[in-house]
Amino acid sequence: MSSSSSDENETTIHSSSNPGSSGIYSQLKAGSSKRPSVRHDVSDAEDDEEPYEGFRKDMNMEVDERITTLLSSLHFEHKRDVVTADEDDNKLRELHENIFSLITTEPDFHRRRRLKKALPASNCIREQVYYLRRKPITPPDSYYHRLNAALHTIVKESFGEEYRKVATVLGLVEALAEVLILEVHAFGIPETNAVEHRNIRKLIANALTNLTYGQILSKRRLCSYDGFIRCVVRIIIESPNITQVYAGLIRNLSWNADSGMSEALQPTVHALSLAAVYAHTHRFDVTAILSALWNLAGHSVENKRTICETPNCLKVLANILSPDARFTTLVDSASGILKYVSQYLATNSSHLELRSLLITRMLTLLKSSSFTCVTNTLGAIAHLIAKDPHMQQLIRQDAAAVQQLNVLRNSNREDIRKAVKEVLNTLNQPCSHRYGDMSHSVGGASGMLSEPQLQMQTSHHGYHGTASPRLLSLRATRASPGKYIHPSQQQHMQVPAPDQRSSSLPRHFAVQRNGFMMAQSFNQQMDPHQQQQQQQQQMIFQMQQQQMMIQTDDQQMRYLNQQQQQQQQQHYQQQIQRNQNVEPVLPVDDDLDIPTSTVMGTRSNSERSLGSMNPGSVMTTGGWNSTLDTAANSSRALSPVSFSDIPASPTMCAQVFNLPVHPEDNQMTTPPNHPSTQNTTHYSSGSANTMTRSDGTTVPIDNLITPTYATLNVTNNAARKTSEDLESPDDILPGPSLEVEEEGDYAIITGAEQKSDDDLLTRSIQEEMPTSSSTPKLKVSPRLNGFFSPSQKTTSSPAWSHPDTSPILKQTQRPKHHEMTTDSDRLLMESIMSEMPRSRVISPRLASGGQQYLDPEPDRSSHSKNEEADRRDAIIASHEPSDQGMNVGRGSSPQQQQLHRMESLESQASSEDSFGLNGYQEEHNTSSSAAHTMRIDKDDVVDASLPMDCVDDEDYDYTDDHFDDNYEEDYEDSNATQFDEGIDPQLTIDCSMISSGSGSSLQKAETTAGSRDSGALATSTPIGSVSSLPGVRRAKKVSINGKTRLPVPKTNGSLVDRVRKPVIEASRPRLPPKPSLLKGKQYHEEDLIENQTRDDTIYVNAPIVEAEQERIYMNALKHSQGSPSVNGTPPKSAIVSPYNYQKPPFTERSNGEINEKNVTPNPKQMLVTIV
C-alpha cells in the first residue's frame, strides 16, 4: 500500500502541474522518474541533451491528448441503452485505425512499441461492448473465446507499471467497466453456462485491480463511473464464488480515497459485511473481505454503524481474533476494523452484550507477533473502556493482561507506547469508580453523610483507591441498604443476614457500623436539609460510641483481672471441659470499635476485625462470627502452645488419646480422673483436636477446615523433664510398647510378622542380586537344559526355584533353629560368589550332597555380549531337567560321554574356558584344568543328543504320521541307500571336515546341491515366532559315498534325527542366528579317521570356532590313539561355537600336523559330520 500511495502522489502532482492538459488520463511520461539515476527494466532511451527533453515531453503529451479525445467520442455511459448497428461498428473500426496512426507518430520507440502492443486487446474489449449493446440472448462461442483471450492478455501484462500507464491512455479502464456492466445486465447471474460468465467476470475484476493499483486518477474515474459500484455490489451478494476478487478490487479503490470516492464506495460496506458473515469459514475470502472493510471502516461514521448493525458481523470479528501466527493477516484486518468500530461503540450504548467478549478476545492479542495487530488492539481497547467502568474492571481482574500492558509501556515503537499510555491512564484514573454506583435498596435515604464523614470516607485512609490497576474497583459508591438513616426508619428495617450481598464484600471495601455493611466511598451532592439530618445522626452516633467505650473499658478490666487470676493458679482449667452445649465466656477486645485516627490509618477505616471479642459488637450481624482473641493469640489454633507440644517428626502428629497423663504436666493435659473430651469444630470431621492456649473456640468461616496437631500426652511412668533437661523432643513424646500389643505409631514384631519380614528380606536380597551372566538367578537356555541333571524330569525353571538347590529360603520352607547359622553362611557365600566376575556353575555332586557352592573359572580379559549370552545359557544347567530324554550312546566310556556332552554346549569365543574337553582333561591331566572346569561325576548320565539348533521344538510332532511321505518325490538320489532303522543315534559331530568354496569338489557339490534342493537357506527361527515350522521330515536317503545327509526342510526350520523325543515346551528361548564364516582344514590324520568313520554332512546355521575345532580334534586324536574303540567308532563329539567369532589367519605349525589352506568361507553354513 505504501508504493501505491507514492504512485498516487506522483500522479497527482503531475496532473496539477500541467493545468493545460486535457482529460483524466494525463500520466507521467513512460520511463521518466523524479530521480534521473533510477532506470526501470523497460525504460525509454533518454537523451542527455536538454534541448530535446522538453520537445519530447510535448510530443508525448500531444499523442496522449489526441488519443484521449478520440476515445471520449464513444460516450459509453450515455449510449449504454442504444442498440448498435453495422454503421456503429464501421465507425469503431475507423476510430481504431486513427488511434494506430497516432501511435505511429510517437517519437519514443519504446513507448510506441508498448502502445502498439496494448492496442489490439483494448480494441477487442470495445468491440465486445458494441456487441453486448445488441442484448443477445445466447452469445456465440466467438464471444467467449475472443473476450477471454483479450482479458488473459490484459491481466498478464497489467503487472508491469509501464503497461498500466499505457493501458490507461488507451481507455481500458472505462472499456472494462462497461463490459462488466453490460455483461451483468445482459446475462445476469446465469444458471446455464455459469462457468464461462464467472471466468469472464473474474478476469475483469483482476484486470481492474491491477490497472488501478497506484493510479489515483484511474481509481477516481472507476468510482465515479455510472453503474459500476451497483454492479459490483450485486456480484458480491449474488455470486459468492467470485466475492474474493471483487473484494480485492474494492480494497484497492478504498485505499487513500477522497471524500467523493468514499461516498461512492459506501454501498459496498453492507454487501461486504454480509459476505464476511456468509464466508467466515473460507479463509482467503474472509481475508480479502476484511481487508476491504478495514479501509471502508475508516471513511465515515455511517460505515461503522453499518458494520455494527449487520447481523452477527461483530461476533464473526470477535471469533476471528486469535494470537495464532498463521492467521496474522486475517487478525490484522479484524483488529483494524474493531479499532474503527470501537469509536462508534464508545459513543452509544448499543451492543453491550458483545463488549465483554470483544475485550476478552482482544486481551489475548497483546502478545501477538504483529505490531499492527497490537496497535489496533490497544486502540480498540482504549475506545471501549473510555467510559465503561465494567470493561475497566474486567481488565483489572486479568492480571496477565495488566502485566502485558506494563511490558508494552517500554516498547520501541511510538504508536504502541502512545496506545498503551492511553489505556493505562483510563484504568488508573481516580474517578473511574464513579461509574459503578448502585441505587439505595431500602430506607429511601439519598444522602445523609456529613461533610466530615464524607471527607473521612473519601480520604486515602478511608478506602482503597482504584488508582492501582491491580485492585478491584468498588462495587458500589452508595450504601445498600442505607446506613445513616433516621432512627424511626431504622427500626422498621430488617437486619441483614450474613449470607446477604452486603456481607460478601471484602473487608477492606466495607465499613460496618450499627449492624450494617456499607461501601467505603460516597459521592453524591447533598442539599442543606440532608446535611442537617446527617449532622443529627452524627451526634447520635457519637453518643453511642461514648457509651460503647465505657462498656469496653469495664470489660477490659474484668478480662485483665481474669487473666491475672489464671496466671497465679498452679493448675490451669482444662479447656476441653467446656461442652459444645455450653456458651463460651467471650473476652473483650479493648482496642476495637474506637474511632481513632490510628485505627482508621491501620485498619482501612474498618472497625470490624476477625478477632473481635466484644459480645455485643457488630459481629453478631456481620458475615464474620469469630470470637477468637486475635490480640492474645493470632495463630488460630495453628501453632503449639509449649515446647513440649512441638512434634519431633510427622509420625508424632497422630491421634494419641486415652493415655494416662501426669497431673502436673501443663495446661494441655487432662486431669487423671476426668474423661477426655475433644474440642472439635462444627465443620471439621471431628477427629482432630484443636485446643490451643486461647480462651475461645474458633468458628470456621466458609467451611474452611483448619489443619491442627493432635494433643500429645505424656504417660504416667515417663519422667518429666524441663526444656533445659531435654536431650531431644522424643524424650517426652509417647511411643509404642514392644511388650504390650496396642495401637500406636509403630508395629509390634511377633512371630508371624517376623517370618514375613524374613521372607521379605529374602526376596529383597534375591531381587537386588546382580543380573550378570555370573548370577545363578538367570534361567538356563533350554538347549542346555538337561546336560547337568538328566535325572530330574521336572519342568524347566530357574535354579533358585528348586527347593533342593536354592540357597534362599522360600515362604514354604521354615528354617529350623539349628540350621539358621548354616543357611546364613550359605547365603553370605552365595552373595559373595555372585559378585565375582566369573561364571559360576553349581556342581550336581554338591547339590545332591546338600551343600552348594560355585566353582571358579579361569579369568578372562574381555567379555562380549555373545559370551554373556552363552554364559547365561550355561548357568545352573546341572539343576535343570533334561528335555532330551537320551543317553550318550552305547559302548562309550564315561570320559567319552562327558566329552560328547561338553562339546555339545555353546562354547565361548576365546575357547579357553569353554565347556569343551576340560572334563576329559580332568582324567588325563589333573594338574592343568581340574579347578577350572565343571565338576561332573562319572555316574552322571550325559545327554548326547543333537544341539537344539538342529531341532525346531515349536510345533514339531514326533510321531511317524507327521513325517512327509512325499519326500521321495521331491528329492530322489540314485546313489542313496535306504536305512530302515533311520540314523544311528550314536552321533559324532566332527568339524574337521569343512565344506567350503575351495574344498573338495565332492563336498562342494553336495553342499550346493543340498542347499539348492532344500528350497531355502537353513536359517534358524526363534521359538515362538510366526515363522516357526510345524515339523521337519525324516531322513530317507543316505549317500553312497559314506556321507549321510539329513534332509533339510523346505522353509526355515531345524533339523532333527529320527529318534523320538518327548515334546519340548514351546516357550523355550532361542538365541538369534548369527552365522560366521568357516574355513576348512586338512589334517594328516584325516585318512586314518575317515577309514574308521563314515560321516554325514548336515548344514546348520550356527557358526563354529576354528581354534576350538583344532583343539578338540587334537584331543580326540590323542584319545583315539591312547584307547582305541572296540567297535572302531571314535568318541562322540559335538561342537557348537559362540557367535561373532572369526579366527585370525595362522601359519603352518612346526610339527606338520596342520597345514593352512586358502578356502572361500561360506557364512551361511557350518559343516557338522555325523557317524
Curated annotation (Swiss-Prot):
Organism: Caenorhabditis briggsae
Compartmental location: Cell junction, Adherens junction; Cytoplasm; Nucleus
Residue spans of biased composition, Low complexity class: 15-26
Biased composition (Polar residues): 595-617, 666-697, 788-799, 890-913, 1002-1028
MF (Gene Ontology): beta-catenin binding; gamma-catenin binding; microtubule binding
Protein name as catalogued: APC-related protein 1
Span of the signal peptide: none
GO biological process, one term: pattern specification process
Region (Disordered): 1-54, 587-617, 662-699, 720-741, 767-822, 837-936, 995-1030
Alphabetical list of SUPFAM superfamilies matching this protein: ARM repeat (SSF48371)
Disulfide cross-links: none
Intervals holding ARM repeats: 312-356
Keywords: Cell cycle, Cell division, Cell junction, Cytoplasm, Developmental protein, Nucleus, Protein transport, Transport, Wnt signaling pathway
Subunit structure, as described in the record: Interacts (via N-terminus) with bar-1 and hmp-2; the interaction with hmp-2 is relatively weak. Interacts (via C-terminus) with pry-1 (via N-terminus). Probably associates with bar-1, gsk-3, pry-1 in a complex.
Regions of compositional bias (Basic and acidic residues) in chain numbering: 857-874
